[in-house]
Every structure is written in C-alpha cells, then in structure tokens.
Amino acid sequence: MGLFSIFKRKKEEPEAAVIPTNGVTALAEGILFEEEGVFLKWGTDIEADKLYAKKEYRADRTIYQWGEKTILSGLKLSFKTVCWNHKQHGDTKALESVEFLSEESDALDQFQAIRDHLETVLGSSRQNEDMEPGEIALEWRIKAVKVGLNLYNKERPKVKFEIGWWV
C-alpha cells in the first residue's frame, strides 16, 4: 500500500445478477423467460442485450419479436413487445410490456387455455363490465403490473394477452 493509495478510486464490482426462480413473484420487477432462465426488468433497454429474436421497424413503432417463450409456470406462447416511437423517452427502447396476439380460427380455445392457466397460477380475475356482448376482458394485478387477457369478436375472434407495467 503506497502513500497515495488512499486517493485512488476503488473499483466497484458489478452486482451479480439474481435470476428469480418463480415467474409469478418476479412479475412485480420484470418478466422471466423460464426455459432460458432469462429475466428482463421492466423499463430496461431492450437493445442492451439483444435477446429478442427479430426486430421490425414500422413508421410509428418498433416491434421486437421474442419468439416462443415459457412464462408464469409453464405458459408457452409467442411473445412480442411494441415500442411506440412517440411514447419512448429518448433513443432508449424500454421494456414496458410483452404481449401475445392471435386472430387464428382457434382464438376462443387459446383464450380459454390461457385463462385457465392464469386462474390456476394467479387466482381469480377481475372482469371488465364495459365490453360488447360476446367480448371478454379479464385483468389481474401484481403490484404495479397489469396482466390483461381479452377476447374480441369483430369480423373474427381475436385473443390478446398482455403483461406490463405501463399497460
């Protein structure tokens, strides 16, 4: 130890990343992709680690395709994140939500399977009363995070499942 070593700046060691093991309890802080063991905190820069499978540019938004991922104790779906250009702060594309959207002919079956899984894992939902006949909107809250599951019947059935802290 030299005479002037007390003036040297100590090197800060980076904190070890703690990956939660339970995706349900982790929802308050971020999303856990269970098979890969990847945990993404809400609000972090999506571009930082480039863990997405595909990126699509549109005029007013950027869509990050995550691919088929398992979340919430076994729910396996193909997820994406939409970053609207007018809502982002600066050049950072922040992770605010992940969503699954399907307009396939089996949308009603998909809705029922997702609903059954969510009710098993998260408990009973709060149902939105302001929907058109034949449409369903279910919602769960985990602290500041909203889990939403919707079934729309316009021209054909459409299911939308979304988890996020700005939803």
Where are these regions (language model features)?
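Short Gly/Pro-enriched loop/turn and capping motifs at secondary-structure junctions
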Residues: 105, 145-146
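Short, exposed beta-strand-loop hairpins at the edges of beta-sheets
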Residues: 147-155
